[in-house]
């Protein structure tokens, strides 16, 4: 009797860019899986509603809701951090197991044959309880993953001297020699080690090498230093570079399927009227938010640069200098189709929070960056951009108008900017090669599909 077709459950962490990145990954997996394979994408109801806006689902991919932990009647008044805490508590209490049971029911009783998802412990626990292998998808940078895997060793080394040794390079830790103590993610050697996120990430790093059947990395061959990749490969099973995930075949909606992403504010048409490489694109993602006084400095710096800019900013520029929107040669919108914007010929610079999804979108578009990290692994990503790879610059602390004007002018018109652009385009070419039919990422993805579709 033939075995049943694979039923893959993809479990999302429904905050920041995690779910969107994993959703792109799930779309690619749905496109590549053998005929008869079904996929259930587990996330909260609110997150599913947002992801549905990206376009129609492939026929073999469905949403399955998991508990968000939000008490009835409190939905409208909760802050994002509070929502995250409630979700994690629900997940720890068995929310993902409930989701896997719902996935089985929605698939006509077909048992889940593999669990794919963010590298969080509750996903591993739920997979174990369901008797299914767990395959982890790391959505952040490889350097951040190595830092989390080495947390105990780093804490023993740095001790309570994180502040006094902030500028010291981590040369004693293989794969991390290009990074300083200050670049490490929050909760590794500084910050509140008992904060729920710090504890969670520490636990997942301890569990990952033992529990995961394979680990997908959001990077491509040649991007990370060889000693970093070697260090990861020594600790993780089937460590497969597959990124940027949004470039996997089938990951993005396409115009020929009438699923092209919307551009409700006319960003691309506005860019069409600008000269090549003349525009600075500014976006700090969905969760990073600068203080009002820093936003004012950013606005003043953009105006002082004299360059046209496209600024994706939720809400209004209440803190901007008086008359800014009337005087400055820019467009401010609450949302922009970022991948399409970065690919546009008019965009010559990217001012970013250095979230990993944004960094990878910038790399794959060949656009040099000016990084203003805020939290998490963003400082490490900014260090990678500015020092390890050299295709951008990083602000030293909060943005000032002078620093913004100088960064934009450098990236768009300066000699250093030309060097950074050349490096960005070199990396872009490497990305393209990795995703050719016989490229490293395509071959690794074929191996990944084979692993998750075993039944």
UniProtKB/Swiss-Prot annotation:
The active site is at 18 (proton acceptor), 118 (charge relay). The lineage of its organism: Eukaryota, Viridiplantae, Streptophyta, Embryophyta, Tracheophyta. One of its GO terms (biological process) is anthocyanin-containing compound biosynthetic process. It catalyses: an anthocyanidin + UDP-alpha-D-glucose + H(+) = an anthocyanidin 3-O-beta-D-glucoside + UDP. GO terms for molecular function: anthocyanidin 3-O-glucosyltransferase activity. UDP-alpha-D-glucose binds at residues 139, 336, 338, 353, 356, 358, 361, 377-378. It comes from Hordeum vulgare (Barley). An anthocyanidin binds at residues 18, 148, 376. Keywords: Glycosyltransferase, Transferase. This is Anthocyanidin 3-O-glucosyltransferase. The gene is BZ1. Its EC number is 2.4.1.115. Belongs to the UDP-glycosyltransferase family. It holds the Pfam family UDPGT. It comes from the Eukaryota. In the presence of other necessary color factors, this glycosylation reaction allows the accumulation of anthocyanin pigments. Pathway: Pigment biosynthesis; anthocyanin biosynthesis. PROSITE patterns: UDPGT.
């Amino acid at each position: 009797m033939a075995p049943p077709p694979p039923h893959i459950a993809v479990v999302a962490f429904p905050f920041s860019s995690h779910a969107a990145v994993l959703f792109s990954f799930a779309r690619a997996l749905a496109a590549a899986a053998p005929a008869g394979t079904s996929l259930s994408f587990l996330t909260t109801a609110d997150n599913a509603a947002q992801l549905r806006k990206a376009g129609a689902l492939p026929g073999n991919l469905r949403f399955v809701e998991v508990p968000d932990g939000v008490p009835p009647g409190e939905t409208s008044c909760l802050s994002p951090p509070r929502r995250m805490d409630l979700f994690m508590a629900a997940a720890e209490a068995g929310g993902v197991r409930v989701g896997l049971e719902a996935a089985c029911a929605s698939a006509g009783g077909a048992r889940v044959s593999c669990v794919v998802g963010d590298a969080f412990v509750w996903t591993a626990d739920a997979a174990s309880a369901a008797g299914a292998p767990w395959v982890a998808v790391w959505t952040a940078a490889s350097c951040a993953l190595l830092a989390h895997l080495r947390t105990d060793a780093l804490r023993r080394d740095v001790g309570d001297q994180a502040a006094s040794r902030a500028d010291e390079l981590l040369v004693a830790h293989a794969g991390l020699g290009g990074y300083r103590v200050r670049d490490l993610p929050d909760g590794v050697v500084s910050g509140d080690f008992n904060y729920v996120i710090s504890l969670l990430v520490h636990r997942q790093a301890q569990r990952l090498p033992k529990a995961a059947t394979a680990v997908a990395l959001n990077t491509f061959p040649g991007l990370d230093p060889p000693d970093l990749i070697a260090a990861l490969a020594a600790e993780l099973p089937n460590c497969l570079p597959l990124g940027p995930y949004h470039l996997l075949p089938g990951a993005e909606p396409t115009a020929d399927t009438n699923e092209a992403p919307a551009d409700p504010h006319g960003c691309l048409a506005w860019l069409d009227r600008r000269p090549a490489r003349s525009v600075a694109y500014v976006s700090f993602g969905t969760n990073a938010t600068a203080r009002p006084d820093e936003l004012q400095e950013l606005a003043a710096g953009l105006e002082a640069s004299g360059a046209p800019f496209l600024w994706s900013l939720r809400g209004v520029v209440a803190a901007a200098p008086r008359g800014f929107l009337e005087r400055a040669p820019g467009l401010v919108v609450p949302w922009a189709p970022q991948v399409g914007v970065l690919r546009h010929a008019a965009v010559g610079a990217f001012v970013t929070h250095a979230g990993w999804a944004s960094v990878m979108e910038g790399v794959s578009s060949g656009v040099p960056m000016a990084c203003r990290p805020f939290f998490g692994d963003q400082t490490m990503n900014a260090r990678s951009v500015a020092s390890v790879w050299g295709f951008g610059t990083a602000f030293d602390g909060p943005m000032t108008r002078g620093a913004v004007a100088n960064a934009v002018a450098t990236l768009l018109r300066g000699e250093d900017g030309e060097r950074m652009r050349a490096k960005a385009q070199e990396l872009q070419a490497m990305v393209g090669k990795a995703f050719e039919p016989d490229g490293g990422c395509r071959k690794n993805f074929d191996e990944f599909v084979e692993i998750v579709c075993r039944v």
